[in-house]
Amino acid sequence: MSKSLNNLQPWGAFFLRLVLGVAMIYNGYDKVIPHGGFHGNAFSALDHHSHYVASLGLPYWLGYVSALAEFIGGILILLGLLTRFAAFLIACNMLVAIAMVTRHHGYSGSEYALALFVIALMLLFYGAGACALDRKIGFA
């Protein structure tokens, strides 16, 4: 039985990629794309998120990095492109989310960020798995 499960291992990483990629794109979308489209200031959503990050005592520019890591990192994870790099960025982002954001609530609600952190670590350590562009270009 373990041999047949080992054959399915690349597909486990594929499904983790799907979950993490969709979650990160969903979470990052509102931080990158302004509500109502790009009328006026294209950076208004990023600025809003950066102000929130700065209110936590972190550098303002880290808000830009955080939002782009979520949105673009989610796209990369979903495609299986530069998976380990994107997983590293997302893992760092989730670690900051657990440490800085959820601490104001007694860490209540940190389970979601913790689960995404663990999925990102799995992809960082084990790679993209099946159906990944990394395999096609030799990054696997």
PLM segments and residue spans:
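Extracytoplasmic catalytic/substrate-binding loops of multi-pass membrane glycan-assembly enzymes
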Residues: 41-44
